[in-house]
């Protein structure tokens, strides 16, 4: 079976790469988060399952008697993605796969701001605690990937409490 892990960028068909779209159209089974499955192009197979845990996905793929399957992820498969855990699980299970990366949120934000991002420091505050003041004190632009309890508002509040309230913050949301 051909297994393809696909980054869906902002989660809409418009942010799929051509290779990602081709892999989706050729898949007989598509797995991923429910919100992503709901956004798939209409031409994709209706055989879909809302799974996002690596072990559950591996178990479903092992018992699938099909030629091609796809697993979708929001953002880019290489930027703080659940794809990394799935890659480890697929490797351990001996299941071969390919990866089609998507457009990351940092790329989408940089494009919206008309700014290059090669000098930005990239920090994940998604589902984990972080000290934004310590990160921002080096003077470089910082991109925080947020989620869970670490929202843009909580990061800005922490900056203000750390005497860094003069730091300019830009929030990118629903970029796709």
Specify the residue positions occupied by each region the protein language model found.
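Short, glycine-/small-residue-rich phosphate/pyrophosphate-handling segment
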Residues: 105-138, 147
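Class I S-adenosyl-L-methionine
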Residues: 1-103, 107-108, 127-131
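A contiguous loop/helix-start segment that scaffolds small-molecule binding in enzyme catalytic cores
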Residues: 2-5, 18-19, 66-69, 138-176
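Hydrophobic side chains in well-ordered alpha-helices
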Residues: 82, 109, 154-158
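Solvent-exposed alpha-helices and their adjacent loops that cap or buttress functional pockets
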Residues: 22-23, 63-64, 91, 113-116, ...
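Generic secondary-structure signature for well-ordered alpha-helical cores
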Residues: 29-32, 114-118, 160-165, 174
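Short loop/edge segments at beta-strand edges and connector loops
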Residues: 101, 124, 173
């Amino acid at each position: 079976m051909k297994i393809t892990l696909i980054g869906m960028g902002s989660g809409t068909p418009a942010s799929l790469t051509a290779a990602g779209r081709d892999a989706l159209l050729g898949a007989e089974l598509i797995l991923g988060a429910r919100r992503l499955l709901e956004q798939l192009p209409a031409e994709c197979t209706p055989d879909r399952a809302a799974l996002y845990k690596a072990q559950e996905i591996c178990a479903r793929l092992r018992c699938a008697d099909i030629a091609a399957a796809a697993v979708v992820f929001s953002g880019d498969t290489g930027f703080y993605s659940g794809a990394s855990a799935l890659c480890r699980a697929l490797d351990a299970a001996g299941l071969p796969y390919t990866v089609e990366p998507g457009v990351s949120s940092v790329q989408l934000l940089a494009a919206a701001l008309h700014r290059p991002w090669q000098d930005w420091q990239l920090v994940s505050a998604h589902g984990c605690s972080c000290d934004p003041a310590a990160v921002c004190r080096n003077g470089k632009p910082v991109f925080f990937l947020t989620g869970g309890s670490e929202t843009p508002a909580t990061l800005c509040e922490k900056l203000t409490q750390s005497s860094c309230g003069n730091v300019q913050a830009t929030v990118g949301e629903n970029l796709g």
